[in-house]
C-alpha cells in the first residue's frame, strides 16, 4: 500500500526550487522578449506555486488522515525486474554500445495501515490468521443484535403459541392416530409455502419433492392404522385443530427462514428466550379469560403434575425446539418438517422394545415409506434440487412422441430396372 507521506516539511527547499525554476524560464524568455515580461512572468509563477504550496500543505496536515492512518513505516524496495548479471562475453559487447538513460525510483517505500474499523473487508481478504479466527470475525460482523432478535421473536411468539395450542387441542378432542395423520400434512404446506416464499435455492418446488411428501403422508397413515383403536368419539373439530396446527408450523418455519437466511446470524437460545418472555408477559391474561368464561378451570397443579410440566418443558419444548430449528437452518425447512414425522414410527419402536407391544404388518409397511421419504428429500436437497421424476417423465414423453424414421423396404427384382450404359450408346452411334 503506497501512500504519500503526511509529515510536515519546511517550505524553504520548495521556495528555493521555485525561484530557480522561475529564473530559468525568465532567462529562456529573456533572449526573445522584454525584461518587463520576464518580471511579470516570474511574479505570476511565484504566486501560483505559493498558492499550490499552501494547498498541498493543508492537505498533508489533515487531521482526519493522520487519525485514521498508522505511523509511516519505511521499507526498502526490492526490484524483481532488474536484469541478472550477464556473462563476461556479453560485457565486452555492452561496453562498446552507449548506455541509455534510465528512470530511477526511490529505494524506500512508505507503508501505512488503515484501522480494522475502516477497512474490515480488506483485513479479511488479507488475513494470515487461521480459518477459525476468520470465521469468528465474520460471525461477529453478521450476527443479529439483541434488538433485532427481540423484534423477530415478538412476531413469531404468537405463531409458535397458536401452533402448539392447536396441536394440544387436537389431542384432547380427537384420536392420536388422526392427529398424527393430519399433522403430517405439515410437510405439504411447507413445500408449497417454501416455493412461494423461498429463502434459498434449496426451497424450489419439484415433482420429486411432492411425491416424497405424499409418500411420507401415506406411510404415516399406515403406521397409525396399525395401532389405532376404534372408538366412536371422533370429532370434526379436532381434525380442524390438527390441520390448523400443521399449517401454522409450516408458516412458522418458512417465515423464520426467510427472515434469517443463515444459522450463524441468529442466536437461537436468545430467540427462544424472548419467545418465552413475550408469551409470559402478553398471554397471562388468557388464564383468567378461560377460567371465567368456563372453557377451562384454572387451578394450581400438584407436585407430580408440576414436575411433569417442568420436565416436559425442558426436554419436550426447549431442547427439542432448539435442535429442530437448528437443524432446519442447517438443512432446509422441508427436511426439518419431514423429520417430525419420524417421531411416530420411532415412538412405536420404543414401545415394542420397552413394553413388548406387538404390531401388525401395517406398521412395518408404513414405517419404511416414512424413513425412505426423509432420506429421499435429503438427497434431493443435497444435489441442488435434483428432480429425477421430472427427468424420467420427459424422457418417456420424448420416447413416445418421437418421429418414426422412414425405413427403406428391400425392393423386389421386378421393380428393379437396368439402365443402358452411356458407353454402349456411344458405340452404337459410331457404328451407324
Curated annotation (Swiss-Prot):
Q: Which residues carry this modification: Phosphoserine?
A: 116
Keyword list, A-Z: Membrane, Phosphoprotein, Signal, Transmembrane, Transmembrane helix, Transport
Name used for this protein in its record:
Solute carrier family 35 member F5
What does the sequence similarity comment in the record state about its family? Belongs to the SLC35F solute transporter family.
Q: Which cysteines are joined by disulfide bonds?
A: none
Where is the chain membrane-spanning?
152-172, 177-197, 205-225, 236-256, 270-290, 304-324, 329-349, 361-381
Q: Does the keyword Metal-binding apply?
A: no
Which positions carry the signal peptide feature in this UniProt record?
1-33
- Location of this chain's protein in the cell: Membrane
List cellular component terms (GO): membrane
Bilayer disposition of the protein: Multi-pass membrane protein
Q: Which gene encodes it?
A: SLC35F5
- Organism whose genome encodes this protein: Macaca fascicularis
Protein role: Putative solute transporter.
Q: What is its main location?
A: membrane
Domain EamA as annotated: residue spans: 161-225
Amino acid at each position: 500500500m503506497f501512500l504519500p507521506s503526511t509529515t510536515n516539511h519546511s517550505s524553504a527547499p520548495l521556495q528555493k526550487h521555485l525561484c530557480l525554476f522561475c529564473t530559468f524560464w525568465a532567462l529562456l524568455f529573456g533572449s526573445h522578449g522584454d525584461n518587463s515580461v520576464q518580471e511579470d512572468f516570474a511574479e505570476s509563477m511565484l504566486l501560483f506555486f505559493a498558492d499550490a504550496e499552501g494547498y498541498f500543505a493543508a492537505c498533508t496536515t489533515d487531521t482526519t488522515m493522520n487519525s485514521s492512518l498508522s505511523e509511516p513505516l519505511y521499507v526498502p524496495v526490492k526490484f524483481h525486474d532488474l536484469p541478472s548479471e550477464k556473462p563476461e562475453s556479453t560485457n565486452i559487447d555492452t561496453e562498446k554500445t552507449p548506455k541509455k538513460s534510465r528512470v530511477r525510483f526511490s529505494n524506500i517505500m512508505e507503508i501505512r495501515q488503515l484501522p480494522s474499523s475502516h477497512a474490515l473487508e480488506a483485513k479479511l481478504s488479507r488475513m494470515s490468521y487461521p480459518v477459525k479466527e476468520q470465521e469468528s470475525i465474520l460471525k461477529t460482523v453478521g450476527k443479529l443484535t439483541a434488538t433485532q432478535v427481540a423484534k423477530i421473536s415478538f412476531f413469531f411468539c404468537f405463531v409458535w403459541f397458536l401452533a402448539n395450542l392447536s396441536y394440544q387441542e387436537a389431542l384432547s378432542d380427537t384420536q392420536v392416530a388422526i392427529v398424527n395423520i393430519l399433522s403430517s400434512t405439515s410437510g405439504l404446506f411447507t413445500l408449497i409455502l417454501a416455493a412461494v416464499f423461498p429463502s434459498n435455492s434449496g426451497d424450489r418446488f419439484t415433482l420429486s419433492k411432492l411425491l416424497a411428501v405424499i409418500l411420507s403422508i401415506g406411510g404415516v397413515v399406515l403406521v397409525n392404522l396399525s395401532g389405532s383403536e376404534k372408538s366412536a368419539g371422533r370429532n370434526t373439530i379436532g381434525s380442524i385443530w390438527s390441520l390448523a396446527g400443521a399449517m401454522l408450523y409450516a408458516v412458522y418455519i418458512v417465515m423464520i427462514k426467510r427472515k434469517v437466511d443463515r444459522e450463524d446470524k441468529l442466536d437461537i437460545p436468545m430467540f427462544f428466550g424472548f419467545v418465552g418472555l413475550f408469551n409470559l408477559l402478553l398471554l397471562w391474561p388468557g388464564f383468567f379469560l378461560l377460567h371465567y368464561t368456563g372453557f377451562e378451570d384454572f387451578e394450581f397443579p400438584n407436585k407430580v403434575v408440576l414436575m411433569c410440566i417442568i420436565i416436559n418443558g425442558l426436554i419436550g419444548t426447549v431442547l427439542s425446539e432448539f435442535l429442530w430449528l437448528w437443524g432446519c437452518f442447517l438443512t432446509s425447512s422441508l427436511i426439518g418438517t419431514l423429520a417430525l414425522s419420524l417421531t411416530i414410527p420411532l415412538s412405536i419402536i420404543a414401545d415394542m422394545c420397552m413394553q413388548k407391544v406387538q404390531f401388525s404388518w401395517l406398521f412395518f409397511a408404513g414405517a419404511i415409506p416414512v424413513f425412505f421419504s426423509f432420506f429421499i428429500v435429503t438427497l434431493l436437497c443435497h444435489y441442488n434440487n435434483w428432480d429425477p421424476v421430472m427427468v424420467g417423465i420427459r424422457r418417456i414423453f420424448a420416447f413416445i412422441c418421437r418421429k418414426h424414421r422412414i425405413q427403406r423396404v428391400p425392393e423386389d427384382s421386378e421393380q428393379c430396372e437396368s439402365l443402358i450404359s452411356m458407353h454402349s450408346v456411344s458405340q452404337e452411334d459410331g457404328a451407324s
